[in-house]
From Swiss-Prot:
The C2H2-type zinc finger 5 is required for nuclear localization. It comes from Xenopus laevis (African clawed frog). One of its GO terms (molecular function) is zinc ion binding. Its main location: nucleus. This is RE1-silencing transcription factor B. It is found in: Nucleus; Cytoplasm. It holds the Pfam family zf-C2H2_REST. The keyword Cytoplasm applies.
Amino acid sequence: MATQMVNQSTGNSLFCTSTYSNISLDNDMYGLHDLSKADMAAPRLIMLANVALTGELSSGCCDYTPEGERQMAELTTVNDNSFSDSEGDRLEDSPSMDIQSHNFIMEMEPAECSKEGTSENDGTLLSNTLEVEVQKDKRTPSPTDDKYKCVKSKPFRCKPCQYKAESEEEFVHHIKIHSAKIYVDNDSNKKAQGNEADSSISEESDVSKGPIQCDRCGYNTNRFDHYLAHLKHHNKAGENERVYKCTICTYTTVSEYHWKKHLRNHYPRILYTCSQCSYFSDRKNNYIQHIRTHTGERPYQCILCPYSSSQKTHLTRHMRTHSGEKPFKCEQCSYVASNQHEVTRHARQVHNGPKPLTCPHCDYKTADRSNFKKHVELHVNPRQFLCPVCDYAASKKCNLQYHIKSRHSGCTNITMDVSKVKLRTKKGDIGVADVDANKQTENGNIIDKSVEETVKAEKRESCGKAKKSIVNLVDGQVAKKRRLSSTQKKIKTSDARPEKILDKSRKSSCVKRKSDLLENSNDTQTSTV
């Protein structure tokens, strides 16, 4: 806990011994009760302020010299990453900073002071981002002035936004918008020098967000679709629409939401960093969605097909393929699509949209920032996807997935999802694959023929057995006759001839008997008559 003390020295003091012998700046005045030394040493950068009082007194008691100076040192942001929109709003609403407790800096009522020498406590300039300047008043105040009050017109100035305030109260209220924490440190000379160097580098590195610039308000971007969306705001609200500008860089926008979202890039609250790659984000939901790309988790399942996704937006976009909905339309033609990405790609390919992003290593140009980052990563780290089983390294994730499915399909320790990867045959392996296929087909044909022959033989045997059983039931000798040889058949035919003659004689005798019986019956009838 740091406190700026103004102590009385022998014969050399800015304030009299009876009134201002020992003055201490309260930490609650700057809202420092929640800070500790650990916060100062932490990598999270915070706001520093060094308050100093300097001045000179003439040889006459209570006389104010023209060289008298009262200076309040600069309030400087040292890359405060802990700022957020919600915290800034909370600070504006809470009257935690009481500026009335240090009004003695601006109003001093000298009493009995010594006549000897001068005393000077030099303030230290921390940086040149946010600055409070109290200009020297070269005129000699007359005794008619109210208690020798130093009256200046708008001595407080904020460098980033050029804001000027007449009173310290207005300026402190303005400062609360820029920072979340203000710290009073009386030993920050060395830190100030390093911070000045860092701030100069950051100012030199500030570049435009994109080459596409709006002529009406100065809005700039590197994406043509964002520029077209920006023009729609002008068409709706007119040219006098409010423009939100960033006080740290040259970013401008007409949307308050995008402006607050941009401020998080300068003042992130908490950074979520991925342990497997270089990804980081200040939003937990985005971080969770990114982790799913490593684990392969897909909690969002389509109810109409086996499709699954790690993000809800992807599932919503997929459902449009079932419903046939295409709400996104190209502004230059009648092309419609189910998502904005396809419309943007259509505009670049068909209508030759601008491609402001150029690769510094080759002639690659694009308007898509994500594709641009992926392309540059191929130059910086060409093989960043490593196989967990072998020494294989790939430049793209899809290549690694194909490698795992084709070479390590039996490994169970791999967490990467390769279910949607389709294996393909290379050009050099086509001939070998054809020979193997021909051999397999020939072997299959031979096997099929042998199976067919065995089936036919079994069918023949079963049919023969069935026929034999039926013939034996009807006539037991039919089967024997079929088995007789030719000689046996001749013998049987010779033996069968006399049998046929006997049968004929028997038939003739029977006929004679019948005729005799008929004649006898006729005779009896005539006799009776």
